[in-house]
Amino acid sequence: MLKLLLGDPNTRKLKRYQPIVEEINFLEEEISQLTDDELRKETQNLKSNISAELDFKKQKELLEEFLPKAFAIVREASKRVLDMRHFDVQLIGGMVLNECQIAEMKTGEGKTLVATLPCYLNALTGKGVHVVTVNDYLARRDAEWMGQVHRFLGLSVGLIQQDMNPVERKKNYDCDITYATNSELGFDYLRDNMATDISEVVQRKFNYCVIDEVDSILIDEARTPLIISGQVERPQEKYQKAAELSLALIKAKELSKDGIDPEGDYEVDEKQRSCILTDQGFAKCEEYLGVNDLYNPQDPWAHYITNALKAKELFIKDVNYIIKNEEAVIVDEFTGRVMPGRRWSDGQHQAIEAKESLKIQPETQTLASITYQNFFLLYPGLAGMTGTAKTEEVEFEKTYKLESTVIPTNQIRKRQDWSDQVFKTEIGKWKAVAKETAKIHRDGRPVLVGTTSVEKSELLSSLLSAEKIPHNLLNAKPENVEREAEIVAQAGRAGAVTIATNMAGRGTDIILGGNSDYMARLKLKEILIPLLVKPDNEHKPPIPKQRNSKSKGGFSRKAGSNLKKKISNSSTNLFPCKLDEVIEKKLSLLSDELVKNWGDKQLSVLELDDRIATAAEKAPTDDKLIRLLRESLSDVKNEYEKVLIHEEEKVREAGGLHVIGTERHESRRVDNQLRGRAGRQGDLGSTRFFLSLDDNLLRIFGGDRVANLMNAFRVDEDMPIESGMLTRSLESAQKKVETYYYDIRKQVFEYDEVMNNQRKAVYGERLRVLKGIDLKRQVIGYGERTMIEIVDAYINPDLPPEEWNIEQLISKVKEFIYLLDDLKVEDINLLSIEELKNYLQEQLRIAYDLKESQIDKIRPGLMREAERFFILQQIDNLWREHLQSMDSLRESVGLRGYGQKDPLIEYKNEGYDMFLEMMTNMRRNVIYSMFMFQPKTDKNDKN
């Protein structure tokens, strides 16, 4: 009723932006008259005006005032550099982001281009802007691609990548706009708060941040906190023994009901992702291990056995992890990418290593941790973009205080979503997928098949190979990851078949007919790698042979002499045509020139990538070689374009890209993301999901209704089932999962919120110390607090002064401050409590000055260094112990629900008391260490 009376709130919101859009359009003509240098000058003028204003509120008002002009400048720069003009709806998207909201824009509507608008505007403050993407590949692509606009306008652009050292990181964070992944930002924040010297801190104070694929980062990844850990020694043979034992245990066929154990040694709850031993299982384990109690604190076994069972039942090779270089490497469940260097905690990773007979790495202990929710709430300005935010609108609002606004599409969507096909068994489903893929491929349309795991993508690959359908495979396996740019470049060509694991997180548009820009880059890379790249980098040839009925994909490790041969084999698959002789000759001359100037095989693959990417930009350059490279790229691109333009027409006539989903994801949003790959910007396209009653979603969350359906359908495995009841079961299963995971995230957030206030206090204190601000006053402050605490502990104000325990008080004071050795009972006997506190504080200050003069005789400034060292040492050690105590408290506090107490309130109260105790210990330890500090002096040592 309200909606009818007031109209749609989203439409009302969009109307508000219309006058500003008109103002930007009005400015367009005026701005287009400016030369490139004048545009850059405008940027400098805006920057000096805005960054000069120090008051936060007034600066915000200035940004609002200059918004139309700034957006018009970016639009003009983008036209000149990228040949892309922001549509009116994209300008609205930019304004929504500038107001720290979430802009929901459909796939292919140019989210990446929209981000340039608010990033440019907020970078004018000089405080830095972060653009966050889900993976290194996208961060790099956006920094190279959209970064051109900012660089053209005279702003500096930084990029954070996984393998950068701290010096490179600092340089990149100091830029006006920095592109990075969510995990790199989070880990750098934690590392900065473990730094022992201010020079090790790489990040600046946070200012404004735009998150691309915001739902993926703030929702999907919010269940797992970021953790930095250190190694602790644990007996490794226990992992091996538990892994052997897990193989001897028998899984129960069903879960326990009404407290009655099922038949079997352990039950597996896939919904909760847990394994629980039955009474029979406990007895079997105790007998096998020769122990009386698996929970004996002196010789605990339960934890090892549970982890071994989880490794056996819930962590599956080529789904949750892959084996690479004799190590178990985690595969990100949302993006399908490997995460080298990441490990599961609580001994789970060690259990997997034992299961796979790999070398068991030492277990780890948490040194620092934060959830993505609390990390991103540290930004004063936070905005995000996604194709699908409405499904999670409530969560964005509640957790992050972020509104969502749906931005209308620029052109009407022409995509057709065909009805789901459900099969009784999984093998029936895969056969149907292969059949439909083959049919669409023969119609000359490109096909993208989304799978949920490495294992499933390889199963489909073998089915297509049997049908002799050439295809490309994009999953977490290293040999496929290295080909990502190449695979995506040709995914839109006529009849191309691409199998991708969780394409949803890949954020790369598939251009119908193929991407001539990427192909030109790859062609140059193919020619230059053998000449310019160091041989040890050659194990990554850029263009391995495309899969067909004979090849199993991948490539051999022996590169070198085979490299050119391999590349020439594959060229026919990748490139649309042979280059004419004039261009070939030009490329040959270019190669000679580059070898002469850049050296024979002197570059790494990344360095060559960087130079080719710079050449592909339109930003002005003084480098003669980059200009030559740019010319050649343009020639090759134009040559390919001639062929691809016909191919694009053919693909459009055939019906555009067809997307096949092979399993419903736990979240409807991820399904919509996959669908959104087809039909971008008004293109034709179609999608279909193939499902089976064995799929995880239906099996785990579908309940008994689906199990009964399975028995009711007496149909062949390759016969699709269509039923309204089944569709409803699917919908309700997805809603169930979404609610279930929302509750988990809410709980993670609520508990981390308690830690968050403590973390802010500790990290704030640490930063002050690192900067060396008033260290002496800080330590004396610790001492004064300690004196007050000693007086309060030993003197009861309700007793008369003659009954006060003055002697014990004095011995406690001397314990902390040995320089007060001559303090006597008669000195303080007649003082009131308040006078006593003041007297002891005064004595402490005198003693501290005395200590400082002793230390500074050895070396001036040594006292300040000692203060910093001891405060940091105590904060770090005690914080680490505190994190473990809080973990233990969190595990135990859940049981208090049985006693009618709210576990969260109990956790808050006890956590607060533990924190106060930690801070008290820190102050006391620092003051004690400072007075006990006796540096060794060596007469021969000038240092």
Curated annotation (Swiss-Prot):
It comes from the Bacteria. It catalyses: ATP + H2O + cellular proteinSide 1 = ADP + phosphate + cellular proteinSide 2. GO terms for molecular function: ATP binding; protein-exporting ATPase activity. Keywords: ATP-binding, Cell inner membrane, Cell membrane, Cytoplasm, Membrane, Nucleotide-binding, Protein transport, Thylakoid, Translocase, Translocation, Transport. Its EC number is 7.4.2.8. ATP binds at residues 90, 108-112, 509. It is found in: Cell inner membrane; Cellular thylakoid membrane; Cytoplasm. Pfam families: P-loop_SecA, SecA_DEAD, SecA_PP_bind, SecA_SW. Residues 535-562 are annotated as: Disordered. The keyword Transmembrane does not apply. GO terms for cellular component: cell envelope Sec protein transport complex; cytosol; plasma membrane-derived thylakoid membrane. It is an enzyme of class 7 (translocase). One of its GO terms (biological process) is intracellular protein transmembrane transport. It is a peripheral membrane protein. InterPro entries: Helicase_ATP-bd, P-loop_NTPase, SecA, SecA_CS, SecA_DEAD, SecA_motor_DEAD, SecA_preprotein_X-link_dom, SecA_SF2_C. Monomer and homodimer. Part of the essential Sec protein translocation apparatus which comprises SecA, SecYEG and auxiliary proteins SecDF. Other proteins may also be involved. Part of the Sec protein translocase complex. Interacts with the SecYEG preprotein conducting channel. Has a central role in coupling the hydrolysis of ATP to the transfer of proteins into and across the cell membrane, serving as an ATP-driven molecular motor driving the stepwise translocation of polypeptide chains across the membrane. Probably participates in protein translocation into and across both the cytoplasmic and thylakoid membranes in cyanobacterial cells. Belongs to the SecA family. This is Protein translocase subunit SecA.
